Each structure stands twice: as structure tokens, then as C-alpha cells.
UniProtKB/Swiss-Prot annotation:
Protein name in UniProt: Putative ankyrin repeat protein L42
Keyword annotations: ANK repeat, Repeat
UniProt source species: Acanthamoeba polyphaga mimivirus (APMV)
Pfam families reported in the protein's UniProt record: Ank_2
Entries under PANTHER family matching the protein: REPEAT PROTEIN, PUTATIVE-RELATED, SURFACE ANTIGEN BSPA-LIKE-RELATED
ANK repeats: 34-63, 86-115, 116-145, 147-175, 176-205, 206-235, 237-265, 267-294, 301-331
Amino acid sequence: MDHFDQDTYHNLPVEIWKHIIDSDIDSTINLLFSCKQFIGLVCILTNNLNLLNLLVKKGNLKFLEFYFRLNTETNKLYTEQRLRVEQNECLKMSCIHGCLEILKYLISIGVDFRMNDDEPLMLAIENGHLKIVQFLYSKRVNIRARNNRPLVLSCEKGYINIVNFLLDKKASFVSKQNEVFSTACGFGQMDIVKLLVEKGADINVGKIPPIRAAAAGGHLNVIEHLVNKGASINKCSVDSLFSAAFYGHLNIVKYLLGYISEVNIIYYAFEKACINGHIDIVQYLFSENIITKDIITENSNTRYLFYHTIRNKHKHIIKFLIENNIFDKDKKYPDILESAPKDMDPYDYLISFLNYQ
């Protein structure tokens, strides 16, 4: 390179240049490959994986080849084991970033594209790279690896193009646990839900039934679609209500209350909302008189509700309940609030007082 780059290199000690490049490889990568002096720093960088990741991400195959050749030929500390580790990582990075040319190159020099039970395939699916998935399939990877994980993962991420490809290649969504379909429902991937329903997916059964999965994920549109398609909501309405309350999905709680009237069941949903800090559900159930002061105080499990809500430090829930004169009758909450130091929020004091008893 020109004298400017060489002079620039000699203006600072090698240790300083190493620190500069290590601290921000994204901004300094072009400097690293500007002249032979800077290129020599490649062998002493602290985290070479950052550099390799950037080269793969940019699709810089020539620089990648040069990196391996430079280290192999000039770096006495560069062992065969380190070479294999870095090449394996580069192959995984090529699947993450969708760099087909680099993937092909690494496979051509013998890097194992089926490492760790087809991890490269999983990484390509997780990041939505259909071309990588198609190429790996042509290399005879197992598209049913890890108990059908490729299809489950593509449903989770919502990549319908990959789902279609896997189905075309005879991956099956049918299983006793119905994991593929329930996953699509749980992550709200409506296009995939519709596709699988059209192909005959069971809309009722599963280790986690589809409606319950959708309730836990907060996807009312999926629940409504399944019900419209004939799903039996009554069979899983209770567990679905509990899941919606646990995860804080008020719109689904409202919807499911249209199918549930038992006070004890609704109380336990209220309890889950309290313990997990979902004030909007708590206030809604209370304001609509679905849950009342009498229902709470007369329930034999009130102590459990307060204990865990306080342990989880949900001050806004505790404050709401006490301001409505609702509390575990065995605890003198008003007295504790009154005894709070003047420089401390009374409810913070209550929580700290009860948590350290």
C-alpha cells in the first residue's frame, strides 16, 4: 500500500493498534486490510471470532480465505485444532447470515455441515434463510432432526416459505403432541395456522392444546379462527383462562369469560394475575364485579395470594387491594403501613417488612 498507510502504522506501538482494532472491529476492518503492516495484526487480535463474523456477514470470501492462509503459514501459535474451531464457527455464521457462497466454500474444504445434530440447518431456519435450507437439504441433512425441530422452529419464527418447503419434502406436522401446530398457534403465526388447518391439522388436541397455546401467547385472532373452524373451546377454556391471566392478556381473559361462570375458577385466574403483576386484569375483574371483596376474603387461599404477590414485589397490586380494604386477615397491613419511616414509601416498607420476616 502507499507510504501514508505504512507511516500511519509506525506512528503508534503495535499494542495500541491492537487495542484500537479489538475495541471496534466493525469500524476498523478496512484499516486492517489496508497494508501488510496492518494485516500482520490479524494474528494477534484478542477476539478473532468478531473479525470472522464480520467477514462472513459481509460475504467477504477472499478476505476469509486470506485470513486462514495467513494464520496457517505465518502464525506459529495457530494450531490445527484452532483452525477447525474457527472454520466450524464460520460455517455456522454463514448459515446465520445467509451467505451461501461462503457455506459452499467451507463445505468444499471439508468443514462438517452436520455438526451438533444438524445445528447449521437450525441456524439457517432460525434466521429465515430458505436458500441455505434448500442447499443443506440437497446435501442430505436431516430435516426431521431433534424430534422435528426444523418444522417446529420455522413455525415459531413464522417463515411460511420454509414451512412450505419442509412440508413439500415430506416433513410431517402430525404427531401425538401436535407440537408443530400448537407452536404456530402459540406464536400467533396466522398464515401458518391457516395453512396447517387446510392441510388437516388437529385443532383440538396436543400436549399444549392449540387454543391454550394461543391464549398463553396472547393471540386472540388465532383463538377466534380455531373456534370458527370448530375447535371445542369448552374442553380447554379453564386452562386457557389461567394461561391468559398468568401472562397478562386482558383481551383473551375477557373473551374466555364468555365461556366460564364458575366463581372459583375465575378467582384462581385473578390470583394468577395478582401474583404476576397484571394490574389491568385485576382492575377489570374488580371493576366489573366479576371478582368482589367478599369473594377474595372468603377464599381459603387468600394467604397464598398475598404471600406471593408481596414476594414478587408487585406494589401496585398490593396497593390496589389494600386501598379497597382487601387483605389477608392474619396480617395487620394497615398497622404496618402506619409504622413506615417518614422517608420511605409505605408500600415499599410493607413489602420489605414482610419479605424479611
